[in-house]
Amino acid sequence: MSNPQDQLSNDLANASISGDQSKQPQQQQPQQQQPYFNPNQAQAFVPTGGYQQFQPQQQQQYGGYQQNYTQYQAGGYQQNYNNRGGYQQNYNNRGGYQQNYNNRGGYQQQQQQQYQAYNPNQQYGGYQAYNPQQQQQQQTQSQGMSLADFQKQKAEQQASLNKPAVKKTLKLASSSGIKLANATKKVDTAKPAASKEASPAPKDEEASAEPEAKKESTPVPASSSPAPAAADSTPAPVKKESTPTPSVASKSAPVSASASVVTADALAKEQEDEVDEEVVKDMFGGKDHVSIIFMGHVDAGKSTMGGNILYLTGSVDKRTVEKYEREAKDAGRQGWYLSWVMDTNKEERNDGKTIEVGKAYFETDKRRYTILDAPGHKMYVSEMIGGASQADVGILVISARKGEYETGFEKGGQTREHALLAKTQGVNKIIVVVNKMDDPTVNWSKERYQECTTKLGVFLKGIGYNKDDIINMPVSGYTGAGLKDRVNPKDCPWYEGPSLLEYLDNMDTMNRKINGPFMMPVSGKMKDLGTVVEGKIESGHVKKGTNLILMPNKTPVEVLTIYNETEQEADTAFSGEQVRLKIKGVEEEDLQPGYVLTSPKNPVKTVTKFEAQIAIVELKSILSNGFSCVMHLHTAIEEVKFVELKHKLEKGTNRKSKKPPAFAKKGMKIIAILEVSEPVCAETYKDYPQLGRFTLRDQGTTIAIGKITKLL
C-alpha cells in the first residue's frame, strides 16, 4: 500500500462507500486482491466534478462477489444469500443498490444501466432474471470506458433522475426472500399493520387483512432486520412511528407518497382507536361500571340508605361517620347523620331534604358503582330527571311506615312520578326497596310488605316495566339490614332473597357500545383552571388528547384531562362511566347542560323540529296545536311547542287514525310534530334510545312521555 496510486485509489474507494465499510467489512477484502485494477483509469477519472462515487473498481469488487457466488449456485441463491445477509436483503436494506445509492447522488441509475439484467424497477419473481455471466461481461466492458462515454452516461443519468420514480413498498412474504413490488396507490400496500403506539387492538382482523405485512413470518437474522435500517435511509416523507413497512421512494415523488401516507395514517389511527372489551375488563380487574339512582318520595330514606351503603362498603371511613353523628346530634337531627354523607350542603342538612342530585362512588368485589341520589321533593323533579337520564338501574325507595307509604304513593306523592320518569329516561330495571321495615309500626311485618309491593307492582307494570324487571326486597336503611348482608332470619323469617348489593353484583350487565361513535351529553359544567364538563358516556370511549366536537354549536374541542368517578386522573374512559372532562377550545359560559360532546366523524344530529310518538299520562285539560310545555331530552331542558297533531293511535293495536285528531287528552297516544325554540341534540329512538326519548312537563307535573321517530 506504499504506492501513492494505490493510496489514491483506496481514498477514493473510502469516499464512495462513505462509511459503509463498517457495516460491510467483507466487501473490502476482495478489493486488495483484485488483479484487474488499472491505475490509468483512476488518473483519467476527474473527481472535481463531484462524482467521487463512480468507482470502476467498485464494480470489480462486486464482480468478485459474482465469481465467488457462482460456485454456490447448486444450493440456490436464495438460501445462500439469506444466510449471509442476502444480495437483495443486504443491499436493499443495509444501504443497498436502490436506497443507498439513491441517497448518495444517484448511483442507482448508473448501476441499473450497467446491470440491465438486475433491474429492481421490474417485478421479477426472485432471482430468475439475474444472470451472473452477463454481469461479468458488462463489468469487463465498463472498465475500458472513456471519459466521453462516462459524461454521456452521466447526462442520461441526470435525465432519468428527473423522471418521477415509481414508489416502492417492501412486502415481506412468507418465503425467506424479499420481493420488491411496484406499489400502486392502493391503501393496502402502504397500510401499516398497526402503529407503534397502537392500543391493544383485536389483532386477528389486522392479521387476516394483510398477512404479508407480518414481520414475524420472515426468518431474517436480527442484524439485517429490514425496518430500522430502511427507516434510517429512506428519504420519503414517511412518519416513522406509524409505518413499520419501509416504503422506498425517490425525492422526486414526495406528493404521491405523502398522499398515500395520510390515508395509511388515518387507517392506522382507526385501528388504534378500536378497543378490545377483554382488555378493558383486565384494566379494571374485570369490574364493569354501573350507575344506580335512588329515587322515591321525600323522606323515604334515600340519602340515609346511600350513606349507609358507602359506610358498609368502606368508601366512607368510620371516623367521618362518627363526626357526622356528633354534628347531627348537636343540631338536633340525631337520626339523620347517615344522610349527611350524601347531603353535603348546609341547606340540605338543615331541612333534611336533598335538593341537587348527589353523586358518590363505591366499589364491591365484583363491580364499580356510582350512586345518584335524586331529590324526592316535587319542586326538584327536573333535577331528578337529569339524574335518571344517567342511570342504568333504578332503586325506588318506599317507606313501610304507616302513613308515609300512602303519602308517597297516592295523589301528589312522588313515588309514581319518579317511577314513570325513570322508565322514560331509559331505566329499564327497577328495584323496589321497602325501607324502614325495622320501624316499631312495621316490625318486619310480611302483611305490610306485601301491601306496599302489590299496589306498586300493578302501577309499575302499567307504565311499561316487565314483570322480570321489577324486584322487591325489605331493608332497613338506618340499621343496614338487607343492604350488604342478608336480613337476619330471626327478624324476618319470611324473606330468603338476596341483599341489595348481592343482587346488584349478580344481575345481568348492560350491553355497552365501547367501540361505537363517542357521545356524552353534558349534565354539568364548572370552571377549574379551564372548562370542565361532566356527564355519562353513552357510547364509545375517549382518551386524553382526543379531538371532539361540542354540539349543537359545532365547536371543536380537545380533551386535556379525564377525571373518573373517584376524582382521579385517567388516560381513558369508556361507555357507561360517569366522568369529568377538562376541555380546551370552549369557554364555560358558552356551553350548558344538554350540549353533547361527540366524535367528529359521527357527530350527533341537531334539530329544531321532529316527529314523535307521545303518550299522555297526566293532563288536567286537553292539548291541541300550539300547546307549549317543557321538554326534558337526555340532559337538555327546552321549551317545546306542538306544531301539528298528525295521528291518534288506537288502544291495543297502535293503528294510526287517518284523520288528524283535533285535540289530545289524558290516556291517549298520538303522533305529533314538535318544534323547539333552540337547536337541540337528538337522535331517533331506534338509533340511539338515550338521545331519542323525552318527557314533557307542565305546571310542575309530568304530562307526557315520548320517543322521537323522525328528525325533520
From Swiss-Prot:
Intracellular or extracellular location(s): Cytoplasm
Region (Charged): 144-282
GO cellular component: cytoplasm
Sequence ranges of Low complexity compositional bias: 24-35, 48-64, 132-141, 190-201, 218-256
Gene Ontology MF terms: GTP binding; GTPase activity; translation release factor activity
Protein name: Eukaryotic peptide chain release factor GTP-binding subunit
Taxonomic classification: Eukaryota, Fungi, Dikarya, Ascomycota, Saccharomycotina
Modified positions (Phosphothreonine) in chain numbering: 370
Job of this protein: Involved in translation termination. Stimulates the activity of ERF1. Binds guanine nucleotides.
Region of interest (G4), ranges: 435-438
CDD domains, alphabetized: EF1_alpha, eRF3_C_III, eRF3_II
Region G1, annotated ranges: 296-303
Protein family (similarity comment): Belongs to the TRAFAC class translation factor GTPase superfamily. Classic translation factor GTPase family. ERF3 subfamily.
Organism: Candida maltosa (Yeast)
Gene3D superfamilies, per the entry: P-loop containing nucleotide triphosphate hydrolases, Translation factors
Positions of GTP binding: 296-303, 373-377, 435-438
Top-rank taxon, per record: Eukaryota
Region (G2): 352-356
Region annotation Disordered: where it falls in the sequence: 1-64, 76-115, 132-162, 184-256
GO biological process: nuclear-transcribed mRNA catabolic process, deadenylation-dependent decay
Region Several sort of repeats, annotated ranges: 16-143
Region feature G3, mapped onto this chain: 373-376
Keywords: Cytoplasm, GTP-binding, Nucleotide-binding, Phosphoprotein, Protein biosynthesis, Repeat
Annotated Polar residues bias: 1-23
